């Protein structure tokens, strides 16, 4: 059994917790870690932007990753 991680950027803790709870309820993941206050710096529309985001890291089996990705995209 191979374990893998998915790194998900969310706007805030509430959103990350809702996603984690849903994925756990559906038994798609084994565990979730939430990291608040991540600073992201990126280029958008020709300018450098800076935002604070919350990171959700989920742990799952490799064969479940496509299901996890699909569920996250629906949220």
Predicted segments — roles?
Residues 1-75:
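Positively charged, small/polar-rich N-terminal and surface patches that mediate targeting and assembly
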